[in-house]
Amino acid sequence: MKAHAGVEMQASVEPHRNEPSASGHAVRLKTLVIGLGNPLVRDDSVGLRVVQCLAPALAGREDVDVAEDYWGGLRLMERMIGYDRAIVVDAICTGAPPGTVHVLSSDALPTQRSASAHDVNLPTALAFGRQAGAHLPPDERIRLVAVEAADVLTFSEECTPAVAAAIPRAARIVTELLQTLPGDASP
C-alpha cells in the first residue's frame, strides 16, 4: 500500500462484493459499525453504549463488524480500511436538545475526536487515505449517527438521563441504516 509523508497504512482487506455466492444470491457488502467515545466521560460514552447495545443482535452477521474506539480522524479512517460501508456512532454538541439523534453524511462529519492538534477531521482523513490508495467506503456509504450530548466534561460512567434514553432510538436508526444505506445487495 502506498504511504505518504512517512505514514505507513495497513494493507486493505479484500471486502465482500456484489457478486453472487455459491447459492446464486448476492453477498451483502462488508459494513463497519463503530462507536466512538470515552467510557469515563458522561455523555461522550454514548457511541460506545449504542454499539454495545447492538453487538448481540449483530453478532451472527458475517457482513457486519461492530467495533469501539476512542479516536476519530486518521485512526478512524484506518479502521474503515477494507469496508464497503461504515456507520459511525458518536456524541455531538450542536445546541439541539440533549438526546436528539442526528444522521449525518460523511461530508458533514464534524468528528475531531483527538487529543492531539496533529490529527485531522474525518473528511480530511478519508481524502488522505483514498489518495494513498486505501480501500475505503465511498462518501455516500458513510453515515454518522450522532446523539446530542448534554455533558461531555464530567467524569462518570453513566450518561445523562436524556442521552441514556436516546440509546435505544440510536440503535434502531443504526439497524435501519444497515438495511437502507446504499450498497446493500442482500436478496
Locations of the language-model features?
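Generic structural signal for well-ordered, non-membrane alpha-helical segments
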Residues: P39, D43, G47, H118, ...
